[in-house]
Each structure stands twice: as structure tokens, then as C-alpha cells.
């Protein structure tokens, strides 16, 4: 949902990963945490999706000090009665990452899902940002653990046309970034290409697809905008993501919902919407291997804490979709 480049102060690019890992392990590691079933044993390969089931994660409010950000994630996990599989992190175009958050997630058995903000594709294609991209590649490689990396999400949206340019310009920029990472020998990044769910209905999303050789996970962001947005009807999870699933499931790649959310309307409706979503994912959308809920109040109130019934429904969703043998 965030659409503007984000500016975050993170650790300097020269920070020692080994020292940070030791510090985080000593202070924040959750007892019994495990990354089983998530990545290659060496930690230098791509993110491997679960053979069965679906990973569940969220995006939590990123404001405040480090301890508050950690507490938000841990409080959610206490509510769920299980660990998150995926933690969604937004990083600005010029932000230095991976930082403490990605390292903390890896140590605690979560897959860090980094959304790297957009920049002008024309500027990228001119070579203006090659040095910055090389540095990000070097930092990701030095981290030594698998990362889901999504660059310029929702590129097909009306608010992003100025930045994305034509589909050809976007595709060229995507390939340029991908190629720089590959030439740097980065093997621990999985590329997530993510368009708007509605774009798969209109055909706009597919025009920006850079090709199977440049994408590891295919993704969509979608929301049930009613009742907050005037004129929108109440739509089910299946309705919102059906066109995405129809197109993406035929490409032989794992699918992901990078953002999804639902508002309260009548009592119990949000909970029922989440229950129906779990059933759809379990029985119909089996190629979707990760779903990430947008658990914040931004423009509308998507938070899971809007009602006890909604909170309990998401808890049930997380347990229903849990990959076998992922957790003790």
C-alpha cells in the first residue's frame, strides 16, 4: 500500500553481520525458533516455498523505536499462537538494507520480505543508479541468508505511471537491477514481482511482467475496499484474487499475496471474510504459497484488532494454512 519512496535510517553498509547476528541472538531470539522448511540449509540459496500449506505473515506499523517494532511482531505471534512465517518490511529506494530487522527475522525463523521502493525507471535505465544497486547487491550477499525482495510493487497503478513509465521501460529497469545482482554473485535473493490484483482483471498487470527468467515469485496486492471507499461493493477474497490466480498459477512459480486487507462492516462480516479466505486458500488457491496481511490503519482500518471475532478468524486462518512440520 505505501506508494512513495520511504526514507529510513538503518545501519551503515559496513556493519559487521557476524557481530550483529551475535548481539541479536543473545537478546531477541525466540526459544525454539526455527527456519525449517523455509530456506536452503546453507542460507545462501533462494527462499524455498513450502511443499504443502501456505505461509502466513503480516505488515506491522514501522514507526517507533526498534523495541516497539519487535514488540508488535511478538504480540501478534502471541495472539496467533504460532510464529509468523513472513515479516513484511518496506525500505526506501536509497535505504541501506539488510539491517537489524531482516537479521532479527532470520534469527527468529521468519522469512524477511523486503519491499524496495520505486525509483524512476528512466533514471535506472540511464545507469544513474548502478552504483547504488551494486551496493544493495553487495549488502544482500554479505547478509548470507535468504530474502524475498520485491522491487516497485503495484507498478501498474495509476499513481505509479510517472515513476514506472511504459511497460517496456519498467521491464528494462527490472532486468537491469536483476542483472546487476546476478553479476555480483547474489544467490540468496528471491525476486517477487507484484502488481495490483485488479490489474490482472484489466490486463494491465501482465504488460509489466519481465519474464519467467527474471521472476521467482508472482504476487498480487488486493483489498476489500468496502465500505470505506465510496461506490465499492463488498467483495470476497476469491473474487479479488481470482484473475491473478488464473494467470499466475499457469506459470509454474509460487504465488504470493503481498498485501491484503478487509474492513469491518456489519458485526461478524470481517471475521467471515477471513474464514472464507482461509477456505479458498486451502481448497482452491493451492498454488499460493504465502499471504501477507496489511495489519495497520492507513486510509482505512485494516487492523486485525478491530474486533475479537476478526482477530480469532485470522488466528484460525494462520493455523489452517500452517505448513506441516514447520513448527514444533
Question: Would you name each region that the model predicts?
Answer:
Residues 39-55:
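N-terminal low-complexity, Pro/Thr/Ser-rich intrinsically disordered segments
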Residues 57-61, 178-203, 252-265, 290-296:
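Aromatic-lined carbohydrate-recognition surfaces of secreted/lumenal glycan-active proteins
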Residues 56-146, 269, 273-288, 294-301, ...:
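N-terminal carbohydrate-binding/catalytic regions of secreted carbohydrate-active enzymes
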Residues 88-90, 117-127, 161-167, 230-234, ...:
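The substrate-binding groove and active-site-proximal loops of carbohydrate-active enzymes
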Residues 131-147, 152-217, 221-240, 268-269, ...:
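Active-site cleft segment of glycoside hydrolase catalytic domains centered on the general acid/base Glu
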Residues 87, 149, 216-218, 259, ...:
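Conserved, mostly hydrophobic/aromatic
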Residues 99-111, 115-117, 220-265:
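Glycoside hydrolase catalytic-domain groove-lining segments
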Residues 1-38:
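Secretory targeting and sorting signals
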Amino acid at each position: 500500500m505505501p506508494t512513495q519512496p520511504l526514507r529510513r535510517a538503518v545501519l551503515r553498509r559496513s556493519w559487521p553481520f557476524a557481530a550483529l547476528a551475535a548481539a541479536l541472538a543473545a537478546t531477541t531470539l525466540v526459544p525454539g525458533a526455527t527456519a525449517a522448511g523455509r530456506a536452503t540449509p546453507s542460507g545462501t540459496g533462494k527462499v524455498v516455498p513450502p511443499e504443502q500449506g501456505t505461509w502466513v505473515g503480516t505488515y506491522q506499523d514501522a514507526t517507533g523505536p526498534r523495541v516497539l517494532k519487535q514488540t508488535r511482531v511478538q504480540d501478534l505471534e502471541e495472539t496467533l499462537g504460532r510464529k509468523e512465517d513472513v515479516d513484511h518490511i518496506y525500505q526506501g529506494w536509497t535505504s541501506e538494507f539488510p539491517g537489524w530487522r531482516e537479521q532479527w527475522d532470520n534469527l527468529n525463523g521468519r522469512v524477511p520480505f523486503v519491499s524496495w521502493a520505486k525509483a524512476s525507471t528512466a533514471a535506472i535505465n540511464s545507469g544513474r543508479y548502478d552504483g547504488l544497486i551494486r551496493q544493495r547487491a553487495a549488502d544482500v550477499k554479505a547478509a548470507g541468508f535468504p530474502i524475498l525482495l520485491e522491487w516497485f510493487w503495484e507498478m501498474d497503478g495509476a499513481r505509479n505511471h510517472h515513476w514506472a513509465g511504459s511497460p517496456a521501460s519498467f521491464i528494462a529497469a527490472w532486468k537491469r537491477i536483476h542483472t546487476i545482482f546476478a553479476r555480483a554473485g547474489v544467490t540468496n535473493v528471491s525476486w517477487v514481482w507484484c502488481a495490483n490484483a485488479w490489474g490482472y482483471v484489466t490486463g494491465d498487470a501482465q504488460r509489466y511482467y519481465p519474464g519467467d527468467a527474471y521472476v521467482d515469485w508472482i504476487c498480487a496486492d488486493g483489498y476489500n475496499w468496502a465500505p470505506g471507499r465510496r461506490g465499492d461493493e463488498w467483495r470476497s477474497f476469491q473474487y479479488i484474487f481470482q484473475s491473478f490466480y488464473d494467470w499466475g498459477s499457469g506459470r509454474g512459480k509460487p504465488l504470493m499475496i503481498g498485501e491484503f486487507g478487509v474492513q469491518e462492516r456489519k458485526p461478524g462480516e470481517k471475521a467471515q471474510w477471513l474464514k472464507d479466505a482461509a477456505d479458498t486458500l486451502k481448497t482452491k488457491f493451492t498454488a499460493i504459497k504465502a499471504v501477507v496481511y496489511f495489519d495497520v490503519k492507513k486510509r482505512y482500518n485494516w487492523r486485525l484488532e478491530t474486533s475479537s471475532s476478526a482477530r480469532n478468524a485470522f488466528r484460525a486462518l494462520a493455523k489452517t494454512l500452517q505448513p506441516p512440520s514447520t513448527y514444533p
